[in-house]
Design a protein with these regions (language model features):
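RNA pseudouridine synthases
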Residues: 1-106, 111-117, 124-126, 169, ...
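Loop/turn elements at beta-strand to alpha-helix junctions within RNA-recognition modules
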Residues: 57, 137-138
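Short histidine-centered loop motifs in beta-beta connectors
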Residues: 127-135
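Beta-rich strand-turn-strand
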Residues: 138-141, 189
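Short beta-strand segments enriched for Tyr within beta-sheet-rich domains
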Residues: 140-148
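Phosphate/ribose-recognition catalytic cores of enzymes acting on nucleotide-derived substrates
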Residues: 148-188
Length: 203
């Protein structure tokens, strides 16, 4: 298996319009194996940080089972606009995919949606901004982004969910996998997040 620090803006899979993607790098990451490594989970194009790949079919299946069962411990950092109502808490809000011809698709909090749960805590603050640590307990699409918006503090740069223009300030900070032996990694903040994090107290 491999754990990569995926750059923000690089899609994991090549889209219908082509362009650069992580797939371009998979042959170099094969490291002598005939089978190309494959992602074991999703990571949004605009999110930087830890991405796990399986190099063999058995390992990919084992990793997939860990993620499906919620046993892979994922930690995210985000810089959000505004502040949550208290120092820590849990968002338990189901998510449903919606779409229109004009606006495309997005995820919304809806009682008819799939269960989604995220714990969070405040790590630091600045004028109009808050640095959050978030731990998703489920793996829904756009879960952290929608849950932050649901808290009333959308992620900085998240135009889709109310965080304004600019680059998305969301980092897949760490991953811990209960393998034998255990495996894990921590990713540094990408350059575009460092000023906002420093303003909130990161050093």
């Amino acid at each position: 298996m491999l754990i990569l620090d995926k750059p923000a803006g690089l899609p994991v899979h090549r889209g219908p319009r082509g362009g650069a993607s992580l797939e371009d790098w998979l042959p170099a990451l094969a490291l002598g194996k005939h089978r190309l490594p494959q992602p074991a989970h999703r990571l949004d194009t605009d999110t930087a940080g830890c991405l796990v790949l399986g190099r063999t079919r058995p390992m990919l299946a084992e990793l997939g089972a860990l993620f499906a069962a919620g046993r892979a411990a994922k930690t995210y950092w985000a810089v959000v606009r505004g502040a949550p109502p208290r120092p820590s808490g849990t968002v338990d809000a189901p998510l449903l995919k919606r779409s229109t011809a004009k606006e495309g698709w997005w995820m919304a909090v809806d009682p008819a949606g799939q269960p989604a749960r995220t714990t969070w805590r405040v790590l630091g603050k600045a004028a109009g901004l808050t640095w959050l640590e978030l731990r998703p307990k489920t793996g829904r699409t756009h879960q952290i982004r929608v849950h932050c918006a649901h808290l009333g503090c959308p992620i900085l740069g998240d135009a889709r969910y109310g965080g304004g223009e600019g680059r998305l300030h969301l980092l897949a900070r760490a991953i811990a996998l209960p393998l034998d032996p255990p495996r894990g990694a921590t990713a540094p903040p990408p350059p575009h997040m460092r000023d906002a994090l420093a303003a909130c107290g990161w050093a």
